[in-house]
Structure formats: structure tokens, C-alpha cells
């Protein structure tokens, strides 16, 4: 599943790198430029050889700026988000972002011949919160539906969720985070995430 997500995420991210300020529908923006960037990823020898520094550079520069990590973290935390102090919310957002980047950067080296099928956008033209639907087609394997929950803020579209085969990426963490908060409080969750990320809890 991680491989399919990476193919879709990179396709999604590519559009925003080129057209961050264009007045385009989010699905049209993705479709227009994603294939070019996916081809770049496919042919990058450093990525194909598993160069983790290069992989994370791509993730951080082309993907991360196009996601609303604060909202993603709030969704993953559920009601516990409101119990966190502003400083705790900041730490949680930072650690969750790092976790996602680390988790999915490893699958980037597995990208080969996947293609992306972009579905028509079914949303009110004036809506600021839409779902962009795509399907990752993999040779010899069943296609995987990957949808992006996106919100327009200050004229810019950003994603706040990725739904793979009907399963939300961020809310999939909710039970795990809830258990950790019950066991060790919000600071305990922060410490656990920091340990996983190798950054240590300060």
C-alpha cells in the first residue's frame, strides 16, 4: 500500500510545485503536470539506488509544502487535540510530519511503472473543501483507489488527508494515538513519536 500511496502523493505534489498560484481546479492542476514529475522520479538514479538523503529531499521540497500537517495531526488526534496546549500541538504536528515523511520516503524507491488515472472532480465549483479522486494502476495487480481531501486556504489548495482504498491515512492513526495518550498523556505520545523519528524528546 505504501508504494501505491507514494505514486499518488508524488503525482499530487508535482502539480503544486509548478502551479501553486494558478487559478485551476485541484484535479486539473494535478493531472496537467504530474506525469512529467513522476517520470523524473522514475529516472532519478539516486532515488532508484535508494539514496535516502535524496529521497527525503524530494519529499520535503515537493510534497510536504502542499499538505496541511496541522489539520492532519488534529484529525489523527481526534478529541485529544483540543486538550493539548499550543506548544504540545506544535510538537505533535512536527513529529507527525516527520513520521509520515520517514514512513513513505522508503517506499519511493519502489516506484516503477505505476500510472495514475484521474477521476472527474465532483464538487461545487465554489467549494473550498473537495475530494480529488485518483486510481493507481499497477501492472499485474489490482488498481488502488487513492483520494485526497483538500482545502483551499488563502487561495492555495492543500491536502489534509489521503484515503487509500477507503481507509483514511490520518484517522488510521487515531486509535493508536488515543491508546498512547491514555497510557502516558499527550507528552507521552510526543515522546513516543520523537523516539520513532530518532529525534529524541526534549
For each predicted feature, which ranges?
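Sec/Tat signal peptide C-region and signal peptidase I cleavage site
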Residues: 16-22
Amino acid at each position: 500500500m505504501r508504494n501505491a500511496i507514494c505514486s499518488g502523493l508524488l503525482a499530487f505534489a508535482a502539480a503544486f510545485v509548478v502551479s501553486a498560484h494558478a487559478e485551476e481546479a485541484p484535479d486539473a492542476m494535478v493531472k496537467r503536470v504530474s506525469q512529467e514529475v513522476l517520470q523524473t522520479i522514475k529516472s532519478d538514479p539516486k532515488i532508484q539506488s535508494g539514496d535516502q538523503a535524496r529521497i527525503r529531499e524530494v519529499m520535503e521540497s515537493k510534497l510536504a509544502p502542499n499538505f496541511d500537517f496541522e489539520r492532519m495531526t488534529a484529525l489523527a488526534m481526534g478529541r485529544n487535540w483540543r486538550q493539548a496546549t499550543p506548544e504540545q500541538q506544535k510538537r505533535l504536528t512536527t513529529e507527525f510530519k516527520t513520521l509520515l515523511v520517514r514512513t513513505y520516503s522508503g517506499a519511493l524507491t519502489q516506484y516503477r511503472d505505476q500510472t495514475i488515472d484521474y477521476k472527474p472532480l465532483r464538487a461545487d465549483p465554489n467549494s473550498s473543501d473537495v475530494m480529488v479522486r485518483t486510481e493507481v494502476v499497477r501492472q499485474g495487480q489490482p488498481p488502488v483507489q487513492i483520494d485526497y481531501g483538500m482545502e483551499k486556504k488563502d487561495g492555495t489548495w492543500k491536502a489534509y488527508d489521503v484515503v487509500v482504498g477507503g481507509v483514511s491515512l490520518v484517522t488510521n492513526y487515531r486509535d493508536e494515538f488515543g491508546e498512547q495518550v491514555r497510557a502516558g498523556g499527550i507528552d507521552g505520545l510526543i515522546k513516543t513519536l520523537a523516539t520513532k523519528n530518532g529525534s529524541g524528546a526534549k
